[in-house]
């Protein structure tokens, strides 16, 4: 067995980053909800 989480900064940004969220309407909804909730960090 090996560790399943192999962190990569670039991949994380690409998948869960701000620009990716802004591209889709559902992504923008996520950002809106997180702003509403008062999250300190909106995205990865």
From Swiss-Prot:
Keywords: Ribonucleoprotein, Ribosomal protein
InterPro entries per record: Ribosomal_bL34, Ribosomal_bL34_CS
GO biological process: translation
Record-linked Pfam families: Ribosomal_L34
Biased composition (Basic residues): 7-23, 30-44
GO molecular function, one term: structural constituent of ribosome
GO cellular component assignments: ribonucleoprotein complex; ribosome
Family statement: Belongs to the bacterial ribosomal protein bL34 family.
PANTHER family (UniProt xref): LARGE RIBOSOMAL SUBUNIT PROTEIN BL34M, MITOCHONDRIAL RIBOSOMAL PROTEIN 34 FAMILY MEMBER
Full protein name: Large ribosomal subunit protein bL34
Organism: Clostridium botulinum (strain Hall / ATCC 3502 / NCTC 13319 / Type A)
